[in-house]
From Swiss-Prot:
InterPro entries: CtaG/Cox11_dom_sf, Cyt_c_oxidase_assmbl_CtaG, Ribosomal_Rsm22-like. It holds the Pfam family Rsm22. One of its GO terms (cellular component) is mitochondrial matrix. Residues 1-39 form a transit peptide. One of its GO terms (biological process) is mitochondrial translation. In the N-terminal section; belongs to the methyltransferase superfamily. Rsm22 family. In the C-terminal section; belongs to the COX11/CtaG family. The chain crosses the membrane at residues 571-591. This is Rsm22-cox11 tandem protein 2, mitochondrial. It comes from the Eukaryota. Specific enzymatic cleavages in vivo by mitochondrial processing peptidase (MPP) yield mature proteins including rsm22-2 and cox11-2. [4Fe-4S] cluster binds at C323, C329, C342, C430. It comes from Schizosaccharomyces pombe (strain 972 / ATCC 24843) (Fission yeast). The record marks R568, T569 as: Cleavage. Residues 592-753 are mitochondrial intermembrane.
């Protein structure tokens, strides 16, 4: 098979991976009263089956086997963004928050937000520390869980997933995990999802209320969600008597609690003594701020220096992730002035309890967790870096490469979001020689290499060398601002301004904050040139004076004229915009009615009973989920209140869902109301099928009566096959109640649109 054909084939299979369904990893995400189950498969088994056919073709054409490097870059390294806590954890924390005093929780949540804002504004030299859970009250613990638990879980899940990719041996060993991080054993929860069932789990926590939460989560809730649960042991302090006993030690959000550098180093020594000498791992994770990265950087330097000072080979150590080297960190923020840090992001779905005590306008369903971390392995030295193993084009990628843990540890890592430009991609990496490199991968480097560069993400390993490279010097990595004495002010002094030549054009020249017009100066220059031979001294000095003083007067006049012109233009624009806005206000209602009558926007009632059969109510799991949001309104003359009991529900095409509205009569007499509904966008209304609802029916409510109104619906499976629905991810279901009015014959007079 020709090489060009192989290249196109591998590109086709690479794009084909987006068409397969995820099936293995379970992730439960609740939205309101409805819990939806998503299935994901991180191994892309279907893509492997297709790649096996391509490998057979390569073998038959006497070419090496398909590159495992390509397999790694295509599927193994891609991280899932659909991370969320289990439903039972969410319900448990939600129940704790609702039982507590709302005022205290909101106060402590605001205090945490203020501390986070203060941390980002303070310089590194200013003292700052987080409050330890040891001194927290019960409402403070709940406020911390509300603010930090989803973010901390997403960060640790991403770190452990990356650790499993880079160091594949960690999943094969017997796991003895020690979680001494801040919170209710979040590191242990993340390890359950990434690694096989560990042999033993220990959690360090002193707070009595937090210990109770840990017991409930890890002994009562977690065993019901796992086929092979592990009951953890809760400890009051670090088990310093069990040195070299744990294969994985996790400390998240703990370094910011240290008051001094001595306390920080003592804590690191204690953690390091608990790590097993036979390849044990220490995971340190902090918030992705300047202070958090600074602590991670100091801990990294301290532990590496500690291992170098000992002659015992059992205490050898090296960085597993994210650094591909054991040298000095090239990002030096303590001696610089830029907020240039090594941090990463992880997308995740917010838990329902995270939306409590949050204004409605600030509620979101997902967010990103910023974190800085380091993973250090004890007792094993870093494998030698094979500097000749570099990949530059498609031919190198198609070669047979054995992707193993020693190889992955020396690969460069992307430390900033790739800049995807037209025709090329700019990727900044931290390389194995402790330098920052900028790789530029253009289209001319190869279609496969360019495609992989376009699909690369922040935090990925990237072994490709760009066609164009620039390396930062090891002595000065960060850019420093110029000294204040050498910077220019807004209006620089005259000696810094360019000179105004005699033979300039009539166009104005912009220098600093001054506009120079040279029309009059040009006319005077001609007169001076004509008479300069008669009175050379006079005209020479007068000419110089005019260049300085006369031109300034001209520039001032020009500035005033330009200011008045800009002022008049601005007024004209404001008047025109005001008239247009006023006219648009009067024309909005008829224009909207005309638009709805022509396009069908506003929803169409689906009365075809043949589309309500059970065959259409089968979820199509191979399609994306659609967010259905709810809204309730009443007419101005109706003394009712109408609101949805849930804000949103995520459903698949063909999946049935049940929602509830609550209607309340706030008046002192009985009222009969009739509801109508609206679907936005209107083109999706034909696929929105309601099996049962309360619209177009008379609803009588007694004085001060409150009732629940159900809505049972599903989205027709043909929604997924319609190309016009391709970009529709959100559907709004809105109900409006009107007061029912009758004529003398008892017929309903209320107009429903």
């Amino acid at each position: 098979m020709p090489i060009l054909t192989c290249r196109y084939k591998i590109l086709f299979l690479y794009n084909l991976r987006n068409c397969f369904t995820f099936q293995n990893q379970r992730c439960l995400i609740p939205y309101g009263t409805t819990t939806t189950i998503r299935w994901y498969n991180a191994n892309f088994q279907a893509v492997q089956n297709n790649f096996s056919d391509y490998k057979n073709e390569l073998i038959s054409s006497h070419r090496p086997e398909a590159s495992s490097l390509l397999d790694f870059l295509v599927k193994d390294q891609k991280k899932s963004g659909d991370i969320s806590l289990h439903t039972k954890f969410n319900l448990y924390v939600d129940d704790l928050l609702k039982k507590s005093e709302k005022g205290q929780i909101k106060k402590f949540i605001n205090d945490i937000k203020k501390d986070l804002a203060t941390e980002s504004q303070l310089p590194l030299s200013a003292p700052f520390k987080d409050e330890s859970t040891r001194t927290m009250t019960d409402p403070q613990v709940l406020a911390y869980i509300h603010q930090s638990m989803p973010y901390q879980y997403a960060s640790l899940y991403s770190v452990l997933t990356d650790l499993k990719i880079v160091n594949s041996d960690v999943s094969c060993k017997s796991q003895h995990i020690l979680d001494c991080g801040k919170g209710p054993g979040i590191g242990a929860l993340a390890s359950y999802s990434v690694f096989p069932t560990p042999n033993s789990v220990s959690i360090v926590e002193e707070n009595p209320f937090l210990k109770k939460i840990i017991y409930d989560i890890h002994h009562n809730i977690y065993p019901s969600t796992s086929p092979n649960p592990t009951s953890p042991v809760t400890l009051n302090r670090l088990p310093l008597g069990k040195k070299d006993s744990y294969t994985l030690v996790i400390a998240s959000n703990k370094l910011l609690e240290m008051k001094s550098e001595k306390e920080l180093f003592d804590y690191l020594r204690s953690l390091w003594s608990l790590v097993s000498n036979d390849g044990g791992l220490l995971v340190l994770c902090e918030r992705g701020t300047k202070r958090g990265f600074s602590l991670i950087q100091r801990a990294r330097t301290f532990l590496l220096q500690k291992s170098k000072n000992t002659s015992d080979k059992q205490f050898n150590a090296h960085i597993v992730a994210p650094c591909p080297h054991d040298g000095r960190c090239p990002i030096d923020i303590e001696n610089g002035v830029r907020a240039n840090i090594c941090s990463f992001k992880q997308h995740f779905f917010l838990s329902p309890f995270s939306r409590l005590y949050v204004p409605r306008s600030h509620r979101r369903s997902s967010d990103r967790s910023h974190y800085s971390y380091v993973v250090i392995q004890k007792g094993i030295t870093r494998p030698l870096n094979n500097t000749t193993q570099r990949f530059k084009n498609d031919e190198d990628l198609l070669e047979n490469v054995n992707v193993t843990s020693p190889t992955l540890k020396n690969w460069p890592r992307i430390i900033r979001p790739p800049l995807k430009r037209d025709g090329h991609v700019i990727i900044d990496v931290c390389d194995s020689d402790a330098r920052l490199r900028r790789n530029i991968v253009p289209k001319s480097q190869g279609k496969l290499a360019y495609r992989l560069a376009r699909k690369s993400a922040w935090g990925d390993l990237f072994p490709l060398e760009g066609k164009v490279q620039s390396t930062s010097p090891s002595s000065k990595i960060t850019k420093h601002l110029k000294d204040a004495s050498s910077t220019y002010s807004i209006n620089p002094p005259s000696y810094n301004k360019p000179k105004v030549e005699r033979n300039t054009t009539a166009d104005p020249i912009f220098v600093g904050k001054r506009f120079y017009s040279t029309n009059r100066h040009k006319a005077f220059s001609r007169f001076a040139d004509f008479n300069s031979h008669r009175f050379p001294c006079i005209f020479t000095s007068f000419s110089c004076y005019n260049c300085i003083s006369g031109t300034r007067n001209i520039s001032r006049q020009y500035s005033r004229d330009k200011f008045h012109y800009n002022q008049r233009t601005t007024i004209y624009y404001l008047v025109a915009i005001s008239i247009f806005a006023l006219g648009l206000t009067y024309a909005a209602v008829p224009l909207y009615r005309l638009f709805c009558s022509k396009t069908g926007y506003g929803g169409t009632l689906n009365t075809d009973q043949s589309r309500m059969n059970a065959e259409r109510m089968v979820p199509r799991k191979d399609n994306k989920r659609i967010r259905v949001t709810f809204n309730g309104d009443v007419a101005g003359n109706l003394s009712w209140k109408l609101w949805p009991q849930q804000r949103e529900i995520y459903v698949l095409p063909g999946e049935t869902a049940l929602g509830f509205y609550t209607a309340e009569n706030t008046s002192d007499h009985d009222i009969v109301g009739v509801a109508t509904y609206n679907i936005v966008p209107g083109q999706a209304a034909v696929y929105f099928s309601k099996v049962a609802c309360f619209c177009f029916e008379e609803q009588k409510l007694d004085a001060h009566e409150k009732v629940d109104l159900p809505v049972f619906f599903f989205i027709d499976p043909e929604f997924a096959d319609d190309p016009n629905m391709k970009d529709i991810d959100d559907i709004l279901l809105s109900y409006t109640f009107f007061e029912a009015r009758y004529d003398t014959n008892g017929n309903l007079l209320t107009k429903l649109n």
